[in-house]
Amino acid sequence: MKSRMWATAVAAAAMLAFATVANAGEPEKDGLVYHDATEFLIGGKATQATLTPYDRLPASYEKTTRPELWRHGHHSAGIYVRFRTDSPIIKARWTSYFGAYMNHMSPAGIRGLDLYVLDEGKWYFTGVGRPSRDNKTSEYVLVKNMDRKEREYMLYLSLYDGVTSLEIGVDGASVIGKPQVDSPRRGCPIVMYGTSILQGGCVSRPGMVHTSLIERALDMEVINLGFSGNALLDLDIAQLMASVETPAVYVMDNAPNCKADRIEAHSVEFFRVLRDAHPDVPVVIVEHPLYPTMRLNNVEREDIIARNNAQKAFYEKLRKAGEKRVYYVSGEKLLDEMKDGTVDGDHFTDLGVTYYVKAVLPTIKKALKASPNKVGK
């Protein structure tokens, strides 16, 4: 009886909180009421102690970590905002940290937004926020002409730029508030560390980065710690990963940024930081993808083979030392045999990402079964 009364009280409090947000603010010229996204749930972060709500690295790292790594920490790759609304229209207004541009990636992927809706337990793409070409501040209608019905939404943030402010606009008669459904399930995230590829280079929009595809496939929060050109086995990143309270699985996918000698010199020490903090959490080690350009580029072919040999030796060293909860994904599996999955021979297109997910997901699922930290446990 007491537990039923407590559940009723919690539900009533949740409804009250939901209604309270609904009446805040006055409509602007476009007829919409804008809400600061920090009023809702922000997911996909290893820590909340950041300079801005949408940074990935702790504020304490500003003076201690490498400048290049710190800069990429401002990029909001993998971070999402979860909210619920019955508005027939949803618009976003956001300001980018850098106003970044790259000549081999979609602007929507670099500094746009990506909206998904939860329908019958599955997440579906709903609309993309296209960034302004000339200004750091952008406004875009993500979806419109819907029936007035309460729905759960997830808004993925920019992959290769940061977000300094974000507002969600809904019509004046609507309610909007924090989500009432725990999806992706939080509490025991998968923590993935890697390179520009893991950060999202070079998918068409934020929801297509492979950490987000894995997140939706498993209905589990995934933390994206991809740092373009800077997955160099820095110990402060290992310490950040280790600080996650109840990780389900760690993934080390750093080989594309590490020469063979760096892998040999630093991998075990990086791994030990994770293992000392979480003795039983599985670690998945991923090889360097076999790029299509290896067929003709002799120097690249020899370099990648050397890196993968070093990565395999690292894995085997752990196994010989008695580590049982370590898993390995071969580079041969990461791209389709035809290799039509990159934009420039290195960075993945949406097609390449689907190959990657197909290759790594079975191993991650296997590791999850061995993990002591399970969502809902």
Task: Set out the residue ranges of the language-model regions.
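Short helix-loop-beta junction
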Residues: 211-224, 316
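Structural recognition of the beta-strand scaffold that forms the well-ordered cores
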Residues: 189-192, 221-225, 248-253, 282-286, ...
